[in-house]
Amino acid sequence: MRPAQASIDLEALRHNYRLARRLGGSKALAVVKADAYGHGAVRCAQALEPEADGFAVACIEEALELRQAGIRAPILLLEGFFEHDELRLIAEHDLWTVAATQQQVRALAEFQSPRPLRVWLKMDSGMHRLGLSPEDFRAAWLRLRGLPQIASLVLMTHLARADELDCSRTDEQAVAFALTAGGMRAETSLRNSPGLLGWPALRNDWSRPGLMLYGANPFPQHTENTAQLRPVMTLRSRIISVRELPAGEPVGYGARFVAERPTRVGVVAMGYADGYPQFAPNGTPVLVDGQICPLIGRVSMDMLTVDLTDHPQADIGTPVQLWGDAPQVSALAAQCNVSAYQLLCGLKRVPRIYVGEAAVGKLSA
């Protein structure tokens, strides 16, 4: 079997969720959209369900996957519904939905639901992606709040630049949201992962941790709070070939690396088709049996190459760690000019194995 695999530590996931709840001082929806950021939505939700206040996904397909796997906790559709027919499924499967457009508000007002729906009304406070204008937001709240098909309303917005700790935009968004939502008797939801980790003055009834659940730092630097995160995914493989090159010889496509000295080259079974960044530069750290070795040459579809010259003990079969506790996925992403979100969500064919107390408990249940 090809040695590439992603190890998912479910106890670390639970630790990060508890941290999110503690930092928020509120209820927290665990965001498991995009297959839990590449970690496996069903297994992650199963691990978190005993203590999670609920989950959040992008669309009804992701929600139904969780329901079919036996997840009974609340599930919020972050993009709401795309067709009116989905409202029947939302009611049937007891899902919560965001309403972020006039069309969604109108459809909810006209829907004859077999059971009252829980709706999260979204205001655009400055991100300018989804959400109602402040005027339409208040009008929608007035329209929906007394309808028999609406069980409850939560007022929400989304922070656009909370991962920039020196940016005033987050405070401006929070003030705009508070000015509009003030006086509306409803729970609120404002804080995402960077909002929880970096903006302690913000307050809400529901937070929505996503990236932090998986142990990735949303900031370019570490803080007291991010230091408490535990990486959930460890991406591993092994060396599958070793060769000696004389000085002056190139490595890989395009000869991006040329040996300046006699160089011992290790080939690792991991490439961009697996989700490793294709344009990782020469020198990107790779952990070979606990020792950092530099990436050399261009990353191929199925393989990458590392300089083993200073690690003579490494040989075919030696274990390799691409990210995890070291190097951390956020640091690797920054070095490769991509986001940690992109790396985690980009794992396509790497098999996942689950470890940690939650995995043991689930298997023995």
Swiss-Prot record:
GO terms for cellular component: cytosol
CDD domains: PLPDE_III_AR_proteobact
EC number, UniProt record: 5.1.1.1
Required cofactor names: pyridoxal 5'-phosphate
Family annotation (InterPro entries): Ala_racemase, Ala_racemase/Decarboxylase_C, Ala_racemase_C, Ala_racemase_N, Ala_racemase_pyridoxalP-BS, PLP-binding_barrel
Entry's Gene Ontology BP terms: D-alanine biosynthetic process
Cysteines joined through disulfide linkages: none
Pathway named in the protein's UniProt entry: Amino-acid biosynthesis; D-alanine biosynthesis; D-alanine from L-alanine: step 1/1
Catalytic reaction(s) noted: L-alanine = D-alanine
GO molecular function term, any single one: pyridoxal phosphate binding
PROSITE patterns: ALANINE_RACEMASE
Gene3D superfamilies assigned to the protein according to its UniProt record, in alphabetical order: Alanine racemase (3.20.20.10), Lyase, Ornithine Decarboxylase, Chain A, domain 1 (2.40.37.10)
PTM-bearing positions, type N6-(pyridoxal phosphate)lysine: K33
SUPFAM superfamilies: Alanine racemase C-terminal domain-like, PLP-binding barrel
Residues noted as binding substrate in the record, renumbered to the chain: R129, M301
Keywords: Isomerase, Pyridoxal phosphate
A Pfam family hit: Ala_racemase_N
Superkingdom per UniProt: Bacteria
Record-annotated active site: K33 (proton acceptor), Y253 (proton acceptor)
Family, per entry: Belongs to the alanine racemase family.
Function, in words: Catalyzes the interconversion of L-alanine and D-alanine. May also act on other amino acids.
Protein name: Alanine racemase
Organism listed in the record: Xanthomonas euvesicatoria pv. vesicatoria (strain 85-10)
